[in-house]
UniProtKB/Swiss-Prot annotation:
<keyword id="KW-0963">Cytoplasm</keyword>
<keyword id="KW-0448">Lipopolysaccharide biosynthesis</keyword>
<dbReference type="InterPro" id="IPR029044">
    <property type="entry name" value="Nucleotide-diphossugar_trans"/>
</dbReference>
<keyword id="KW-0808">Transferase</keyword>
<dbReference type="GO" id="GO:0009103">
    <property type="term" value="P:lipopolysaccharide biosynthetic process"/>
</dbReference>
<comment type="pathway">
    <text>Nucleotide-sugar biosynthesis; CMP-3-deoxy-D-manno-octulosonate biosynthesis; CMP-3-deoxy-D-manno-octulosonate from 3-deoxy-D-manno-octulosonate and CTP: step 1/1.</text>
</comment>
<dbReference type="Pfam" id="PF02348">
    <property type="entry name" value="CTP_transf_3"/>
</dbReference>
<dbReference type="GO" id="GO:0005829">
    <property type="term" value="C:cytosol"/>
</dbReference>
<dbReference type="InterPro" id="IPR004528">
    <property type="entry name" value="KdsB"/>
</dbReference>
<dbReference type="GO" id="GO:0033468">
    <property type="term" value="P:CMP-keto-3-deoxy-D-manno-octulosonic acid biosynthetic process"/>
</dbReference>
<protein>
    <recommendedName>
        <fullName>3-deoxy-manno-octulosonate cytidylyltransferase</fullName>
        <ecNumber>2.7.7.38</ecNumber>
    </recommendedName>
</protein>
<dbReference type="GO" id="GO:0008690">
    <property type="term" value="F:3-deoxy-manno-octulosonate cytidylyltransferase activity"/>
</dbReference>
<dbReference type="InterPro" id="IPR003329">
    <property type="entry name" value="Cytidylyl_trans"/>
</dbReference>
<comment type="similarity">
    <text>Belongs to the KdsB family.</text>
</comment>
<comment type="pathway">
    <text>Bacterial outer membrane biogenesis; lipopolysaccharide biosynthesis.</text>
</comment>
<comment type="function">
    <text>Activates KDO (a required 8-carbon sugar) for incorporation into bacterial lipopolysaccharide in Gram-negative bacteria.</text>
</comment>
<keyword id="KW-0548">Nucleotidyltransferase</keyword>
Length: 250
């Protein structure tokens, strides 16, 4: 039986919110908050993969297992691929990528992503989404949108408003029932993770800055379904960070 592991990619030099992995949330750095949240799961291991000696030292201070990776990776998935290779995980094992900026991620969503990959044998990656309920979120590039087919395989991910509802402008009320926000959690089989790192970064991946597009561009399937539980988007801005801080300080 395949083992299931959680790997948290943690890059220090984030673009939109520098050093966010170490941002204080109610007395603890964000990376610790994320780690403590995922320890509520029952998977085989939890690893932090980072390019930063500073993050490594802090993570080891709260007894996390850490793998130090190169600092030139194109994406978190590339970083995880290096980590699982170093750790010697079996090809049939499953790895769940939990973003290092989601300290409130529901455990139910992590479990659902892993189970979806087990259930969808044609997919090499699985992920989650949720219905958009605020029209403003459709036009926010920090909220990645996704469209998928009738069999729940992703067709495309974009920072733009997809699907495009012809005949409406951004200022008009549109039917938001067909808009879904992608939740940045992924489950992969280790064999595909190793292959992913060998694939060339695709033009659409560069254009959208979305690592999952490398999978679709190369003809592989991503299984997707709605999340088990609603969650906040990842912390990308100072405003996002303040929202999370308020929730921890309640």
């Amino acid at each position: 039986m395949a083992n299931i592991h959680i790997v948290i990619p943690a890059r220090l030099k984030s673009t939109r919110l520098p050093n966010k992995m170490l941002a204080d949330i109610a007395g603890k750095p964000m990376i610790q908050r994320v780690y403590e949240q995922v320890t509520k799961s029952k998977f085989d291991s939890i690893i932090i993969a980072t390019d930063s000696q500073k993050i490594k030292d802090i993570a080891e201070s709260f007894d996390a297992k850490v793998v130090l990776t190169r600092d030139d990776h194109q994406s978190g998935t590339d970083r995880i691929a290096e980590a699982v290779t170093k750790l010697g995980f079996a090809d049939e094992d499953i790895v769940v990528n939990v973003q290092g900026d989601e300290p409130l991620i529901p455990i139910e969503n992590i479990e659902r992503a892993a189970q979806l990959l087990i259930d969808k044998s044609e997919a090499v990656v699985s992920t989650l989404c949720e219905k958009i309920t605020d029209v403003e979120d459709i036009y926010n590039p920090n909220n990645v949108k996704v469209v998928f087919d009738k069999n729940n395989y992703a067709l495309y991910f974009s920072r733009a408003s997809i699907p495009f509802e012809r005949g409406f402008s951004e200022k008009e009320q549109i039917n938001i029932s067909e808009f879904f926000r992608h939740i940045g959690i992924y489950a992969y089989r280790v064999a595909f993770l190793k292959h992913y790192a060998e694939l060339t970064v695709s033009p659409i991946e560069k254009y959208e800055a979305l690592e999952q597009l490398r999978v679709l561009y190369n003809g592989y399937k991503i299984a997707i379904e709605q999340s088990a539980k609603s969650t906040l988007a990842g912390v990308d801005t100072l405003q996002d960070l303040e929202k999370v801080r308020k929730l921890f300080n309640v």
